[in-house]
């Protein structure tokens, strides 16, 4: 018999967020922990139009940002082991995340996510967008999703 690789449905990735982050408060805490891991001195959480269809949550930090390699190897890798081997931040903080699934907390907060990141000492930034409803489409696998824009 030939070797058959695993295929992961996009729906599974969405379920990771729903099972690990039971409510919006837990999801926000997870994202604030990410700002800590990025050595941000400050984290601002702004709520806009809460209770309406245009509700928006902004989580703004001043951390180290991500370059394209970090986005590909860490942010876009489900279950990354990066924090197992890089347990301290550049400023010596013990990193709080360990499972490599924190980005799925975003799914708990709304149907659409946009993330902007600018790596330290760089003039080039990245924009990451996702429509979480796309993860529910039948037959879509994780490898079908390409979500990063430069």
Which residues does each predicted region cover?
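GHKL (Bergerat-fold) ATPase N-terminal catalytic module, capturing the glycine-rich phosphate-binding loop
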Residues: 1-148
């Amino acid at each position: 018999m030939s070797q058959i690789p695993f295929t992961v449905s996009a729906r599974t990735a969405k379920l990771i967020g729903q099972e690990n982050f039971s409510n919006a408060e837990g999801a926000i805490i997870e994202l604030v922990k990410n700002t800590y891991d990025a050595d941000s001195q400050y984290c601002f959480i702004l709520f806009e139009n809460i209770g309406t269809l245009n509700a928006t949550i902004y989580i703004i930090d001043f951390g180290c940002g991500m370059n394209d390699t970090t986005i590909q190897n860490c942010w876009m890798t489900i279950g990354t082991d990066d924090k197992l081997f890089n347990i301290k931040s550049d400023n010596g903080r013990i990193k709080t995340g360990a499972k490599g699934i924190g980005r799925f907390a975003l799914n708990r907060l709304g149907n659409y996510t946009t993330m902007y990141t600018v790596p330290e000492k760089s003039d080039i930034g990245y924009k990451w967008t996702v429509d979480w409803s796309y993860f529910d489409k039948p037959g879509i696998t994780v490898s079908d999703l390409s979500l990063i824009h430069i």
